[in-house]
Regions:
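Compositionally biased, intrinsically disordered low-complexity segments
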Residues: 56-61, 69-73, 77, 112, ...
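A sequence-level detector of short, solvent-exposed, charge-rich linear segments
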Residues: 54, 58, 62, 68, ...
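Sequence/fold signature of self-assembling virion shell proteins
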Residues: 2-14, 19-23, 27-47, 163-216, ...
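Charged linear interaction tracts used for macromolecular binding and regulation
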Residues: 219-220
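Long, contiguous amphipathic alpha-helices that act as assembly "spine/axial" helices in icosahedral shell
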Residues: 66, 91-179, 224-238, 274, ...
Length: 348
């Protein structure tokens, strides 16, 4: 590390300590609650997708869901001559609740990288933003791919962070399997084929188009009072996208494709807006309102310390947060997996 870089690093560590009211950021400390809220806001705002869902702080490690979305109709009329008026609970009655699990977001930056950044006047913001952005990406990856919360995670065996926490899709599989379609005429396969509607022997296709699939699951797997709710969207795997729905994606330069956090379809899919979100699994789609998906983080539970490791020629940032991924109301969404497009469906 060059001497001028060291000055920048020392100022960065001093600023982190000052903001959190601790004498030294190189010793483990609890992030100040106000700073934690500001950091979580930065993480959310760094992602177009996370900005559209709920990211809220909770006081308890586990408890009842906050029920942040609409949970059903309340309008009624009562003949008070015969009975009393009755109120309706606006919150979700869900015995599952939530449980926050400690998640480590440990990173490092090599001396060479820091030396290259030292010439920029916004050095501290650059260091902060690269950490914030990766935490946002990791939360999306866990939300769509997480299936367990292992005591010791294995990033080699689980490259999509499947063992870090239990994500939204896995909760549908385990807590609301009736709203999950994983097969059609053939077990383990939902086949899209233009001949699906033909009354001919040997036809194995389940739906003629993705539009037909989406329309059907909205009317068969989602609770009736949510089916026409404004804000229902279709999140689908990248391999199911086509120029019909996303004609502009392939026209973007590679750098913009990489930076695109959330791509919205120009045409509707089964009557709903389609969305391509990073790390959503291939061969799958999810219908939901975005405010039905949440990330809870525990207030006062974020821990951090920053240290230099000259043995590895780098600066290390150790950070942890207690997080939970929550589906507010399973009735407001559904999941379809194992979707296959036939050659006819792909080639039109």
């Amino acid at each position: 590390m060059r001497n001028d870089t060291r000055k920048h690093f020392n100022n960065f560590a001093a600023q982190v300590a000052k903001l959190n009211g601790v004498p030294d950021a190189t010793q483990k400390f609890a992030v100040d609650p106000t700073i934690q809220q500001r950091l979580e806001k930065r993480i959310q705002e760094s992602s177009d997708f996370l900005s559209r869902i709920n990211m809220v702080g909770v006081d308890e490690l586990k408890g009842e869901k906050l029920a942040l979305g609409v949970t059903g109709p309340i309008a009624a009329r009562t003949n008070v001559a015969n009975q009393d008026r009755k109120t309706r609970d606006l919150t979700t009655l869900d015995a599952q609740g939530y449980e926050c699990r400690m998640t480590e977001f440990d990173t490092h930056l090599g001396y060479a990288k820091l030396d290259a950044w030292a010439k920029f006047p916004n050095f501290q913001a650059m260091v902060r933003d690269v950490i914030v952005r990766q935490q946002a990406l990791d939360r999306m990856m866990i939300g769509f791919n997480g299936t367990s919360a292992a005591t010791q995670t294995d990033p080699v065996a689980n490259p999509y962070l499947q063992d870090v926490n239990i994500g939204w899709l896995q909760q549908y599989r385990t807590q609301s399997p009736a709203r999950v379609m994983a097969g059609g005429k053939t077990n383990g396969k939902v086949l899209i084929d233009p001949t699906a509607n033909a009354n001919e022997p040997g036809i194995v296709g389940d739906y003629a188009t993705l539009d037909a699939l989406v329309y059907d699951v909205v009317h068969s797997l989602i609770a009736p009072w949510f089916r026409r709710l404004p804000g229902l969207v279709v999140i689908l795997g990248r391999n199911l996208m086509s120029d019909k729905y996303f004609p502009l994606l392939n026209q973007l330069p590679p750098s913009e494709q990489l930076a695109a956090d959330l791509v919205i379809s120009q045409k509707r899919i089964g009557g709903l807006q389609g969305m391509d979100v990073p790390f959503f699994p291939d061969n799958a789609l999810m219908v939901t309102t975005l405010d039905n998906l949440s990330v809870y983080w525990q207030n006062g539970a974020r821990r951090r310390f920053v240290t230099e490791n000259p043995k590895r020629n780098r600066v290390e940032n150790y950070e942890s947060s207690n997080d939970a991924y929550v589906v507010e109301d399973f009735g407001a969404g559904c999941l379809v997996e194992n979707i296959e497009l036939s050659e006819k469906a792909i080639n039109g």
